[in-house]
Amino acid sequence: MTDVEKQTEIREKKGRNVMRELKIQKLCLNICVGESGDRLTRAAKVLEQLTGQTPVFSKARYTVRTFGIRRNEKIAVHCTVRGPKAEEILEKGLKVKEYELFKENFSDTGNFGFGVQEHIDLGIKYDPGIGIYGMDFYVVLNRNGVRVSKRRRAPGRIGPSHRVDKEETIKWFQQKYDGIILPPKPKVKKNFFRRR
């Protein structure tokens, strides 16, 4: 047996280990309206209909006069979902995207996110009093044993081999949801120095 064959065999054994299985820690849903008032409260109703939980309002960190945003003004609403409900909502969101994501959607720490243009695609009935809102989905993945680094008493560190990385997340997405990874978007070159 060569070294390469031994390493592949070890990887296969590691893959079958229950402690190495990836799971959804949480799903964060975010709707950024960019202003406080009636539109924001309607966005909160949309999230409440979708999750069955009370959403939380996010405040602006600093004043941006061009956008008409003041510091500490409520401009967005978000909600964190865990457990089977998170998997159910994620399934709806991925169905809207047709299980297709770009490689850029995945972070180096093993999380991924995407956006949905219209919330009515998720199965919520259209209400003319609320309107149509888009939202962001952020999925945080981890393995069993992460609590070691989070606990209050005697916290430890997670070794590099147990951390979740980009490639593992992409593989998990392809296996669990039969997902498709699209080729990267073409980069548009802007010509700043035009000749007249």
Curated annotation (Swiss-Prot):
Its main location: nucleus. Keywords: Cytoplasm, Nucleus, Ribonucleoprotein, Ribosomal protein, RNA-binding, rRNA-binding. One of its GO terms (cellular component) is cytosolic large ribosomal subunit. InterPro entries: Ribosomal_uL5 (IPR002132), Ribosomal_uL5_C (IPR031309), Ribosomal_uL5_CS (IPR020929), Ribosomal_uL5_dom_sf (IPR022803), Ribosomal_uL5_N (IPR031310). It holds the Pfam family Ribosomal_L5_C. One of its GO terms (molecular function) is RNA binding. The keyword Nucleus applies. Disruption phenotype: Mutants have an extended lifespan, increased volume and are sterile with a germ cell proliferation defect. One of its GO terms (biological process) is translation. It is found in: Nucleus; Cytoplasm. It comes from the Eukaryota. There's a functional difference between the two L11-encoding proteins in C.elegans. rpl-11.1 plays a role in the germline whereas rpl-11.2 has a somatic function. Component of the large ribosomal subunit. Component of the ribosome, a large ribonucleoprotein complex responsible for the synthesis of proteins in the cell. The small ribosomal subunit (SSU) binds messenger RNAs (mRNAs) and translates the encoded message by selecting cognate aminoacyl-transfer RNA (tRNA) molecules. The large subunit (LSU) contains the ribosomal catalytic site termed the peptidyl transferase center (PTC), which catalyzes the formation of peptide bonds, thereby polymerizing the amino acids delivered by tRNAs into a polypeptide chain. Belongs to the universal ribosomal protein uL5 family. This is Large ribosomal subunit protein uL5A. It comes from Caenorhabditis elegans. The lineage of its organism: Eukaryota, Metazoa, Ecdysozoa, Nematoda, Chromadorea. The gene is rpl-11.1.
